[in-house]
Amino acid sequence: MKTYKPYRHQLRRSLFASTIFPVFMVMIIGLISFYAIYIWVEHRTIHQHTYQTQTELQRIDKHFHTFVTQQQKQWRHVDLSHPADITKMKRQLLKQVHQQPAILYYDLKGSSQSFTNNYEQLDTTKMYLISKYRIDFKDDTYILKIYMSSTPLLKNIKKNSGQSALIVDSYDTVLYTNDDRFSIGQKYQPPQFGFMNESLKLNSHHAHLIIYKDIHETIEDGIALLVVMGVVLILLVIFGYISADRMAKRQSEDIEAIVRKIDDAKNRHLGSYEPLKKHSELEEINNYIYDLFESNEQLIQSIEQTERRLRDIQLKEIERQFQPHFLFNTMQTIQYLIPLSPKVAQTVIQQLSQMLRYSLRTASHTVKLAEELSYIEQYVAIQNIRFDDMIQLYIDATEGVQHQTIGKMMLQPLVENAIKHGRDSEPLKITIRIRLTKRKLHILVHDNGIGMSPSHLEHVRQSLHHDVFDTTHLGLNHLHNRAMIQYGTYARLHIFSRSQQGTLMCYQIPLV
C-alpha cells in the first residue's frame, strides 16, 4: 500500500508555518509598536521639558527685572566707592542669585571697577545671559549682567531623558548649550533625520529655547532588543519544527488508517466499528465511514419516496390539465348558448377543443411562449363569455421573447388565480409582462382585483410549500412544485398583494 509521507510533509510545513509566522508577525509588530510608542513618549516629554524650562527661565528673568526696578531709586544714593555700600550691594545681589533654582552669576561693571560672584573666573561667554540692566549709582553708572551656567532642571533632563538644551537668538546663533555637539556662537542647523526637538520663545529679543534628542542614541538598546528577539525566534523555530513534525506524524497515522477503511468500504469488506488510536476531529470521518452504509439504506428509501412524490405530482398534473370544474362550467355555458347564439356556442366549442388538444399533448413538456400565451387568450376568451366581458387581458411581450421555451401550462395557474380570487363586480384587468435577461425569464402577472389581506397573503405564501394534497391553493402549489422539479432552486415564485389594490405574481425561471 502507498505511503502518505508527502501529505505528512505538507502537514508539517503547514503546522510549522502556522506556528512561526504569527509569532514572527507579533514580534515585528511589537518592535514597530515599541518604537512608535517610544517616539510618541519622547515627543511628549520634550514638549513638557521645553515648557518647564521656558517657565523657569522666564520666571528668573521676571524676578530680576522686578528686583532691579524696585531698587533703582535707592541705588542712586549708593556710593560704590565706599566699602560699606559695596558690601551691602554684594549681599543684595547674592541673596537674589541664591534664591533662584539655577546656577547664576552676576557681573556688575563700572568704568573703574567691577564686582562678580564668579570667583572661579569661569568663561561667561559659554553661559546664557538672562538679563542686562543699566544702573545709575551715586559714584558711577554700572552695567549689571545676570548669567546662567546651568539649572538643576536641565541637568535632570539631560541625565534622566538624554535630552539636551539650546538657546539661540533670532539669527539661530547659539547663545547657550549643554551639548558638546554645538558651540557658542555657531549657527544652529538641526540634523534632518533621527532628531526630535521643540522650540519656544523666551523673551522679547526673540531668543528661543530648544529641547532636542537624537533618537540614534537608542540604537544600542534597539540592537540588544533585536538580539533577544532573534534568540527567542530561533528557539521557537527549533521547538516549532520538532512539534510540527511530531504532530504531523500523529495526524498522518490516523489519516492513513481512514484511507485504508475507505478502501475496505469500497470493496464492502469493512468490519465492525474500530475507533482511531488518537481521539481527534478525524474521528468524525471515521464515524461517517461506518455510518455511510446505514445512510445508503436511508438514501434508497428517500429515492423511493421522491419517486412516489413525483408520481403524485404527475397525477395531479393530469388532474389539473383536465380541469373538471372549468370543463363543467364551460359545458354549461355552451348549453346555455346553443339556443340563444349557436355561432357563439360553436366558437366556444372550437376554442375548448383547441385548449384540450393543447393540454393533452404529451409529445413534449415544453412549448414556445407564444403557444402558451395563445392558450391563455383562449382561456380568458371563454371566461369572458361566462362573465360578460368583465375580464381585460393585456400581454406585454416582444416577439423575441415569445420564441423562448417554457414548461407547458405554467402560466395558466397565474391567470386562473387572478380570475378566481381577484374578480368582483368591477371589470378585472390582467396584465402579463414578460422580460428576458441574460440568464433568466421574468414573468409578471398583475391584476387590479380585490387583493388579499396580510394574513391571507401569508397563508397563500406558506401554502406553496405544503404537500400537493394538503392545500386548497392547488394551482399555485402545483406550479411551484413543478417548477422546483423542472428547474431546481433557480426557479422563484413571489406573490405580492394588498387588500383592494390587486395582486402581483412574479415568476422567475432560468433559460433552458
Swiss-Prot record:
GO CC aspect terms: plasma membrane
Membrane association type: Multi-pass membrane protein
Location(s), subcellular: Cell membrane
UniProt xrefs under SUPFAM superfamilies: ATPase domain of HSP90 chaperone/DNA topoisomerase II/histidine kinase (SSF55874)
Keywords on record: ATP-binding, Cell membrane, Kinase, Membrane, Nucleotide-binding, Phosphoprotein, Transferase, Transmembrane, Transmembrane helix, Two-component regulatory system
Domain Histidine kinase residues, every copy: 297-512
UniProt key word Transmembrane: yes
Signal sequence residues: none
InterPro entries found in the cross-reference section: Bact_2-comp_sensor_kinase, HATPase_C_sf, Sig_transdc_His_kin_internal
Molecular function GO terms recorded: ATP binding; phosphorelay sensor kinase activity
Residues bearing the modification Phosphohistidine: H325
Post-translational note: Autophosphorylated.
Domain of life: Bacteria
Positions of transmembrane segments: 20-40, 222-242
Recorded catalytic activity of this chain's protein: ATP + protein L-histidine = ADP + protein N-phospho-L-histidine
EC code(s) of this entry: 2.7.13.3
Functional description taken from the UniProt entry: Probable member of the two-component regulatory system SE_0166/SE_0165. May activate SE_0165 by phosphorylation.
Protein name: Uncharacterized sensor-like histidine kinase SE_0166
Organism: Staphylococcus epidermidis (strain ATCC 12228 / FDA PCI 1200)
Taxonomic classification: Bacteria, Bacillati, Bacillota, Bacilli, Bacillales
